[in-house]
């Protein structure tokens, strides 16, 4: 069985849909992986037809409580890191985790042994890293990327 690439997305604009479409086309041309798109917005037919699985979940719960807001960081001009709850009005972590759980549950139920989870706004020019990660998953349970400061 092929590895599965799960793409989580929330494409509420044409521009975001086009970014997702570009990623799906890159994966479709590679043809070495099965592809699932999980989204809280409807998935256009032309995108869905190029996937192995498409999962639309209308429940897109956002957290608005002050104590549940995320603290995104940004570093303008690489001069000073700023971390604040006041950069947005809500936290989307619950919605994101819901897509991860739904995608992984479907993958497990269908018998996939290896899953690669990426966001819709990735641009994959070279799949070497995914092939390398697939080999690593023969030995390890998980491969995680972290930001080193």
Language model: regions and residue ranges:
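Conserved donor-nucleotide/metal-binding helix-loop-beta segment in metal-dependent transferases, i.e.
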Residues: 124-149
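A conserved hydrophobic helix/loop-capping motif in glycosyltransferases and polysaccharide synthases
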Residues: 4-15
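Short beta-strand-to-loop acidic/aromatic patch adjacent to the donor-nucleotide binding site
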Residues: 112-123
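Short, well-formed alpha-helical segments that are part of the catalytic scaffolds
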Residues: 13-28
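A short acidic (Asp/Glu
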Residues: 16-20, 46-49, 124-131
